[in-house]
Amino acid sequence: MTLLEDRPPGDVSGRVPLHYASLFGDLHHAQELVDRGDDLRTTDHAGQTPLHYAAQGCSVAVAALLLSKGVEIDAEDHDGNTPLWHATLRTRGEGPIVQLLLGHGADPHHKNHDGRSPARLAKALGGVDMAVRSAS
C-alpha cells in the first residue's frame, strides 16, 4: 500500500497518512491528501490533529497549507495542548513554526489541563518571551 492508496481508518495510534505527511513536512503528499478530501480535523487517539503534527515536526509549509484551509489554530489534544504548545516544546518558542502559528492568531496564553501555557513553557525552557513576540 502506498500513502495515497485506500487508506485504513488509522494505525494503532489512530494516525492517518495526513498525520504522517504533516509530521515529516511532506508538502507534496499533504497537498494530495487535502485535494482528495481527507479530513483535516481528524484526530489520533491522543486527540492530535494534523496541525499538531505539523507543529511537532516544525513543518512550516504543511502547517501553512492546513491553516489556509481553515483548521482550528488552537485545537486541543486530550491534554489540552494546542499546536503552539507542541511547537514551543520542540523549539523553546523560537523559529518559523512558532512565528507562523502566532501570526495566524494562536494564543500563547492558552492553558492546558495542567495550567501551563506555551508562553510559560517557553520561559521554563529558557526560550524567548512569547508574550512580547506575540504582540509584535
Give a label for each model feature.
Residues 1-35, 136:
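Intrinsically disordered, low-complexity regulatory segments in ankyrin-centric signaling systems
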Residues 26-34, 59-67, 92-102, 127-135:
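Ankyrin repeat structural motif
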Residues 102, 107-136:
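Leucine-rich solenoid repeat scaffolds
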Residues 20-26, 53-59, 86-94, 121-127:
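Ankyrin repeat A-helix N-terminal signature
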